[in-house]
Amino acid sequence: MKKIALPIIVIVAILAIVFSLKKLMSTSSDNIFYEPFKGTVHGTAPFSQISDSMWLPAIDRGIKLANDEIEAITSQFEEPDFENTIVALDEVGADLDRVLNVFYPLLSANSNDAMMDIAVEASQKLSDYTTAITLNEDLWHRVRSVYNDRESLDLNPEEQMLLQTTYDSFALSGANLEGEDREKYRKLSSELSALTTAFGQNVLKEMNTYEIYLTADDLAGLPESSVTAAAEAAEAKGRKGEYLFTLDQPVYSAFIKYSSRPDLREKMYRLYNGRNTSGEYSNIDNIKRISELRLEIAKLLGSDNYATHSLKRTMAQNPEAVYDLLGRLRDAYRPALNAELAELTEFATKLEGKPVTIKPWDYSYYSNKLKAEKYAFDEEALRPYFPLDKVVDGVFGLATRLYGLTFTPNDSIEVYHPDVKAYDVNDADGRFIGVLYTDFFPRSSKRPGAWMTNFKEQYITEDGVNSRPHVTIVMNFTKPTAEKPSLLTPYEVETFLHEFGHSLHGLLADTKYASLSGTNVYRDFVELPSQFNENYLTEREFLDSFARHYQTGEAIPEELVERLVRSQQYGAAYSCMRQLNFGYLDMAWHTITEPVSDPVDFESKAIETVRIFDDVDGTMISPQFSHIFSGGYAAGYYSYKWAEVLDADAFAFFKEKGIFNREAAYSFRNNILSRGGTENPAELYRRFRGQDPTVDALLKRDGITPTATVAQLNKD
């Protein structure tokens, strides 16, 4: 054979191509999001292998593959049917979900500047991607065709709900729009996505800018745990001998409740409630534009306002039903609030020996002292009985007694931060239920608050395998110190119970389709499992299972439990009216019919009928109201009170049957926790409870004499 001599330039070109291919292959194989996670326990995320350089390539690739899957659906020759269109569409985007289900939980719990920048870029890409799907005319025609034939398809309830949800997601997202309106919707959605992301990032960034250094003379009234933590925080910053306070929720709450320095309480209050109202991280322009964009989108889709548009897929169904509930609660609780404030003013005046006008930064301080005097109750007296490790045992044990679940630490599962722990969750018969991650302590990379989310949702694979969920609960409890473990207040135990209730909703999911699994339910139903769990806080039988003094091992004394129970109704009217402030403000922003020019004046008028204190210059709710401006609760904050009615009614049923009654527990599990969004929640609730919910149990629990009742909450 004759040898062929290749020109050197060709050889170089070939080598360059080979090198490029190898580099491409290496890059692909090095990005762990390009394939299902392999070689890890239960297929959990290999956090140690993740680098920030992986996020955008994986997101881009996921979007491309998802678009290819959409193309495969729309280009097929077969007539549209449930399997080749609705089910196929539900399965689109597995590769994209794999990266997003890790990215967004970490963005909230363990973020950095690079991830925040990536989130901004990704939000635009994802907004464009989702909008392109809902405005895909060929896809919409197929979905609509199947929906129009729904009566002849012989679908089971879960399949019917998947079809209805799919159809609604298109219809409520502009699929019926034509021509210029479609392009306008696309642009509005893209801008809205960018602004909601920016809003959330501003909240986190501004929170991290505050460092308040105090001296020993400034610490009067503060509990030892707060002082010790502040001293250690200052020392870590190289300022030994001083005391560092931030605006992290547990730090702020303790300061405003216990500091006997009204000037410092006022300073902290103004800082905390003045966040994002001005300066580099101001959200004033963001809230104006976000609300305007939502209004424009609603009008484009045929609704008078955003709330009318958004509430179509809820139990409430319309703004009138929301305002009806909020108004009934306002009228029922207002007389009690007036009485509470009058009593508190009288107490403060007596305590100080001079007339006192209660200011918003005074409420927690005097309220805590009155509570201690009236019920001989102080949350700090209970803190030693709630060391975090024992609370974990108690909360997990609650799920064991009710549902037969067990939680076993698994150190073989990778975690994303040293503070995080991972658990195997198994059923009573040993069957694997899922993975639970717990993340308890504040850090600069974590946003404030408490929440539950999924790294992976439950669903049934094409092969019939029940793919189990990976769930995480995230909180911001005070960290342990060198001398003491993390000791929780009753409120923090309640928060733990709340988020754990959400986690059970995810862990116990048993549905065919991921989009209907776990917490993928109507927004005003999603808080039922979490708020139901809170009821156990004051149950002696539950407390006896774990509450032990961290030093002596002594069980929590009966007298303290009785005080805790008696104190639960204390301040109930204030607590409700505070939530109604948020609910009315949310609805005001989302029932506007014209853009808002002055957010300060708008907010003041929105909460006029539920106002507790006079406005404080320089402070607002809206610029930090992440729930409605970046957290998915737009026109939905009322759902906390809606679900509170449900949870009080549900727990009243357990009180009748026994709080650990297995029959009642399994009915709650099988009809509420495991069913996700597979059926109308009103029907699921009736199946569990045997009747519709009423507001009576909530009013009774709070010690409120009803001025009106809600006969039925479900609006079929």
Regions found by a protein language model. Give the residues of each.
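Membrane-interface motif at the C-terminal end of an N-terminal transmembrane signal
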Residues: I17-S28
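Active-site-proximal, well-structured secondary-structure segments within enzyme catalytic domains
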Residues: E158, L162, A194, Q201, ...
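Positively charged n-region of N-terminal signal peptides that target proteins for export
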Residues: M1-I4
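Short His/Asp/Glu-rich catalytic/ion-coordination signatures at enzyme active sites or charged loops
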Residues: G39-M54, V102-A122, S145-K187, T246-D285, ...
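N-terminal helix-rich structural modules
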Residues: S26-E224, A230, F654, K715-D716
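C-terminal, non-catalytic "cap/extension" segments appended to globular domains
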Residues: S26-Q49, G221, E242, K390, ...
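Short pre-active-site segment immediately N-terminal to the catalytic Zn-binding motif
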Residues: T478-L497
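Hydrophobic membrane-insertion alpha-helices, especially the h-region
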Residues: I9-V18
